[in-house]
């Protein structure tokens, strides 16, 4: 087996569901991100420094290969309490960052066995870059109209992470075909009318998921929408409307089954 096959086999062995590779020099969607900022859609959580956002290399590290991974999780809906409060599925149970970082470091140590003396760095919602953009470059899925990464096997209920490695691998660009086509179920489902489906962007100034993370969110409109949808932290309404998120079998990892209630 070549390096990519060995890496993919080991990733599956440690509980990673999808893996893909891309050269670190691949073209990113800088123009689209600049448009996103220009439209004022940013919530302020993202790195708005264009240079830093798309820089994988540093003074002491030269990025050569991107390895993107995804771990599926169930679209679990926490039982409502007497106030019918809900949390988004991604926030229920064990902190995924800890699990993902453990898997990524495990995979990184495997890379060092393949190429002793090489270097890698990991990220899972912690890098300057976009996990979703990297996942697209590495062929894990496509960007849905609600701006989430959608995979054919696990829908959009996947946690994303990546390893940046200083060893070059042959990794031609293999983008996954867009399967949203004329579907607009997520767009129509959004309680805040926040989805700009033509641009595949979300106006985070309106998105309920972002508003519930903002300490200044309790406007009358937001409170009314929370009362109608039940979410007090995050929001899964658009994802649950997606055909690719129906009949998922994402509940196979025992580590997601801990501390749910």
Give names to the regions the model predicted:
Residues 166-171, 188, 219-224:
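Short Cys/His-rich Zn2+-coordinating modules
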Residues 185-219, 227-258:
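Iron-sulfur cluster-binding cysteine motifs and their immediate structural context
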Residues 172-181, 224-235:
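Immediate flanking context of iron-sulfur cluster ligation sites
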Residues 261:
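Conserved nucleotide- and phosphate/pyrophosphate-binding catalytic cores
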Residues 37-47, 216-229:
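Surface-exposed acidic, glycine/proline-enriched linker/cap segments
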Residues 1-179:
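Auxiliary alpha/beta "docking" domains used to position bulky ligands
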């Amino acid at each position: 087996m070549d390096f990519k096959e060995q890496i993919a086999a080991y990733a599956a062995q440690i509980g990673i569901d999808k893996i893909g590779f891309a050269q670190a020099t691949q073209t990113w969607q800088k123009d689209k991100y600049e448009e996103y900022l220009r439209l004022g859609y940013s919530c302020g959580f993202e790195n708005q420094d264009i240079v830093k956002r798309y820089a994988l290399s540093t003074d002491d590290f030269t990025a050569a290969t991107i390895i993107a991974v995804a771990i599926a999780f169930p679209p679990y809906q926490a039982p409502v309490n007497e106030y019918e409060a809900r949390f988004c599925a991604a926030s229920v149970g064990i902190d995924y960052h800890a699990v993902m970082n453990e898997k990524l470091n495990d995979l990184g140590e495997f890379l060092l066995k393949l190429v002793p003396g090489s270097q890698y760095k990991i990220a899972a919602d912690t890098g300057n870059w976009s996990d979703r953009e990297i996942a697209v470059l590495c062929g894990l899925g496509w960007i849905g109209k609600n701006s989430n990464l959608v995979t054919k096997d696990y829908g959009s209920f996947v946690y994303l992470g990546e390893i940046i490695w200083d060893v070059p691998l042959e990794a031609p660009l293999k983008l996954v075909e867009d399967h949203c086509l004329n579907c607009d179920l997520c767009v129509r489902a959004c309680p805040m009318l926040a989805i700009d489906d033509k641009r595949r962007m979300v106006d985070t100034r309106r998105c309920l998921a972002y508003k519930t993370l903002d300490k200044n969110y309790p406007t009358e409109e937001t409170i009314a929408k929370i009362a109608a949808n039940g979410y007090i932290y995050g929001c899964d309404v658009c994802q649950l409307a997606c055909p690719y998120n129906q009949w998922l079998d994402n509940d196979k990892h025992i580590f997601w089954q801990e501390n749910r209630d």
